[in-house]
From Swiss-Prot:
5-methyltetrahydropteroyltri-L-glutamate binds at residues 17-20, 117, 515-516, 561, 605. Zn(2+) binds at residues 641, 643, 665, 726. GO terms for biological process: methionine biosynthetic process; methylation. This is 5-methyltetrahydropteroyltriglutamate--homocysteine methyltransferase. It comes from Shigella flexneri serotype 5b (strain 8401). L-homocysteine binds at residues 431-433, 484, 599. GO terms for molecular function: 5-methyltetrahydropteroyltriglutamate-homocysteine S-methyltransferase activity; zinc ion binding. The active site is at 694 (proton donor).
Length: 753
């Protein structure tokens, strides 16, 4: 029984973000479709070859996506919303981009599909839309074409396909309500057709991803798996693939399925390998997800070996990444500026492939010397002085309940804030960032590379902040922001100014479409050596009589959007960040900043996948926010912002944050998110986003007014704010000016009644 290895997927964007650059060039009309397709082909060929060279036996094919793999699956099934369809009914790459972005080089612009987080990761997928009586057919053969490409290159191919039940679970019904699970029988023939095509090509194994099987699914959804897989059996061997949690609670459902293998995440799940081995059918292959696909830490391979060795030789076994390596940067070897000791603690996607090769070889041979050698640096880290800061640990231990309480209740604070700011009804503001123009990015890059001295850099940033204030005053906004010209990223910026974080040069991971992020890495205890945002906030406030918001990223979001340590709890990391940022709130307040926004867009996405684990997480997540904010005086208005959220099931926790104002992303969901706030009788102020910043389309005054009137039916008008869905960093100035002008006009119209 020779053990093989495989990965569940590989990063798509390219080491130098080649895919991002090609996409954006094509969207801007600066390159042809054929040039874009060529970049995709080159990246796929390179990535397959890199995995093969690193020692991977079975290469994932079908993990590449032009925007998002769930959207690719929608096109595969012919699930294209009517507003995005080509007039002749055909499907092409621009169809895909219209669903994702709302527009493409061809076809009519239309509202983009809703976007939300992929399980509890920082990757986003485009939510499939389902309507009653919908028909499905195989229309987009990208998977088959890529399999042909890989076969032509003589690779050992393992196609990757998002499973039918998870696909339906991830979608939403549009229009007349019905049970989307009823569409299962309509999509299965397309899956059968795809599997038949793969069988024709001589494919032995197909990785069919059903991550919904790690959730606490309703019984009807669990019951759907057996008939679905009865329909799919027989053409190729199916590796039923789960990740992000364990499968033990749903194992009875899984073992009844006619598949030939199961992949389990042995990093994030609590499944016991020996117990799994006992309960799985004896002829099934077990794919053991031992290498963390979601983090950047070098694995202790001696531990991984010990975790799996008891079942070696007792059944067919593969070793694998826990999930797709999509969530990890590509290659550590190009990081030339990392300190050697710190660098020795990390492994990126290619290094993780090497770990899988080492593990496979040791399990096949019984020789563990190479594992011990590989694991030595991560074992040495446990005693490093870079990791532990006694002062931080002491302050954390001394936190009391009082540290997370504002001095007075919201009603008392609201009165003090009204007296201080004297804002009109329907007050207008933005979420924080303004367009990051080429000039701004060049300025920051030149400074970073040493081509620009500190004085000239500061003068340049000050000019952009001044311009942002002038633009906002001209537009007539009520509460201003400084525009964040000095910030590369809302998390990276804070990480750069806090001790306990390190940064990479090329550690990019895909967030959605062409958007990539370079998450900071938490390597040790976190503290704030000096004020971070005070100087620029103070400067911006000196330019205007209107209030300017101080802008902070909240502790849970910094945690969720960083690569965390694995040796302490997430709660510990969040509270260390909260204490550091608490000092920032006090300093902003002392500098005369009266409105401070603490963004927590990631609060909901940090939720554990199983509801039974939610309460503990929400308790410390809310406490971290409150520790951060509670130092503020009554007449300091604390705002928070949240994105892509379903709030109804966590409204208690949203209210418990006790922010004076919450702004939320609602435009893509047509204000339906406000139902939660209405039903809960949310007591504080709220700014429902009135237009989608992910799309370049400019909303009309009438459209915004209609949304606000809809909002006022649910929330008393005197507690409503008017704002976009999110920050405007990724937009251009022309559409930003036009959209904000319409937003301000809509608010003014409503004030006049």
């Amino acid at each position: 029984m020779t053990i093989l290895n495989h990965t569940l997927g590989f990063p798509r964007v390219g080491l130098r973000r080649e895919l991002k650059k090609a996409q954006e060039s094509y969207w801007a009309g600066n390159s042809t479709r054929e040039e874009l397709l060529t970049v995709g082909r080159e990246l796929r060929a390179r990535h397959w070859d890199q995995q093969k060279q690193a020692g991977i036996d079975l290469l994932p094919v079908g993990d590449f996506a032009w925007y998002d793999h769930v959207l690719t699956t929608s096109l595969l099934l012919g699930n294209v919303p009517p507003r995005h369809q080509n007039k002749d009914g055909s499907v092409d790459i621009d169809t895909l981009f219209r669903i994702g972005r709302g527009r493409a080089p061809t076809g009519e612009p239309a509202a983009a599909a809703e976007m939300t987080k992929w399980f509890n990761t920082n990757y986003h997928y485009m939510v499939p839309e389902f309507v009653k009586g919908q028909q499905f057919k195989l229309t987009w053969t990208q998977l088959l074409e890529e399999v042909d490409e890989a076969l032509a290159l003589s690779h050992n191919v393992k196609p990757v396909l998002l499973g039918p039940v998870t696909y339906l679970w991830l979608g939403k019904v549009k229009g007349e309500q019905f049970d989307r699970l009823s569409l299962l029988n309509d999509i299965l023939p397309v899956y059968q057709q795809v599997l038949a095509e793969l069988a024709k090509r001589g494919i032995e194994w197909v990785q069919i991803d059903e991550p919904a099987l790690v959730l606490e699914l309703p019984q009807a959804w669990l019951d759907a798996y057996k008939p679905a897989y009865d329909a799919l059996q027989g053409q190729v061997k199916l590796l039923l693939t789960t990740y992000f949690e364990g499968v033990t609670p749903n194992l009875d459902t899984i073992t009844a399925l006619p598949v030939q293998g199961l992949h389990v995440d042995l990093v994030h799940g609590k499944d016991d390998v020996v117990e799994l081995h006992k309960r799985l059918p004896s002829d099934w292959l077990l794919s053991a997800g031992l290498i963390n696909g979601r983090n950047v830490w070098r694995a202790d391979l001696t531990e991984k070996y010990a975790q799996i060795k008891d079942i070696v030789g007792k059944r067919d076994l593969w070793v694998a990444s826990s999930c797709s390596l999509l969530h990890s940067p590509i290659d550590l070897s190009v990081e030339t500026r990392l300190d050697a000791e710190v660098k020795s603690w990390f492994a990126f996607a290619l290094q993780k492939c090497h770990e899988l090769a080492l593990l496979r070889d040791a399990l096949n041979s019984g020789d563990t010397a190479a594992l011990a050698e590989w694991s030595a640096p991560i074992q040495a880290r446990r005693h490093s002085t870079r990791v532990h800061n006694p002062a931080v640990e002491k302050r954390l231990a001394a936190i009391t309940a009082q540290d997370s309480q504002r001095a007075n209740v919201y009603e008392v604070r609201a009165e003090a804030q009204r007296a201080r700011f004297k804002l009109p009804a329907w007050p207008t503001t933005t979420i924080g960032s303004f367009p990051q123009t080429t000039e701004i990015r060049t300025l920051r890059l030149d400074f970073k590379k040493g081509n620009l001295d500190a004085n000239n850099y500061r003068t340049g940033i000050a000019e952009h902040i001044k311009q942002a204030i002038v633009e906002q005053e001209r537009l007539g906004l009520d509460v201003l922001v400084h525009g964040e010209a000095e910030r590369n990223d809302m998390v990276e910026y804070f990480g750069e100014h806090l001790d306990g974080f390190v940064f990479t040069q090329n550690g990019w991971v895909q967030s959605y479409g062409s958007r990539c992020v370079k998450p900071p890495i938490v390597i040790g205890d976190i503290s704030r050596p000096a004020p971070i945002t005070v100087e620029w906030a103070k400067y911006a406030q000196s330019l205007t009589d209107k209030p300017v918001k101080g802008m902070l990223t909240g502790p849970v979001t910094i945690l969720c959007w960083s690569f965390p340590r694995e040796d302490v709890s997430r709660e510990t990391i969040a509270k260390q960040i909260a204490l550091a940022l608490r000092d920032e709130v006090a300093d902003l307040e002392a500098a005369g900043i009266g409105i401070i926004q603490i963004d927590e867009p990631a609060l909901r996405e940090g939720l554990p996948l199983r509801r039974s684990d939610w309460d503990a997480y929400l308790q410390w997540g809310v406490e971290a926010f409150r520790i951060n904010a509670a130092v503020a005086k009554d007449d300091t208005q604390i705002h928070t912002h949240m994105c892509y959220c379903e709030f109804n099931d966590i409204m208690d926790s949203i209210a418990a944050l006790d922010a004076d104002v919450i702004t939320i992303e609602t435009s893509r969901s047509d204000m339906e998110l406000l139902e939660s706030f209405e039903e809960f009788d949310y007591p504080n102020e709220i700014g429902p986003g009135v237009y989608d910043i992910h799309s370049p389309n400019v909303p009309s005054v009438e459209w915004i007014e209609a949304l606000l009137k809809k909002a006022a039916k649910r929330i008393p008008a005197e507690r409503l704010w008017v704002n976009p869905d999110c920050g405007l960093k990724t937009r251009g100035w022309p559409e930003t000016r036009a959209a904000l002008a319409n937003m301000v006009q809509a608010a003014q119209n409503l004030r006049r009644g």
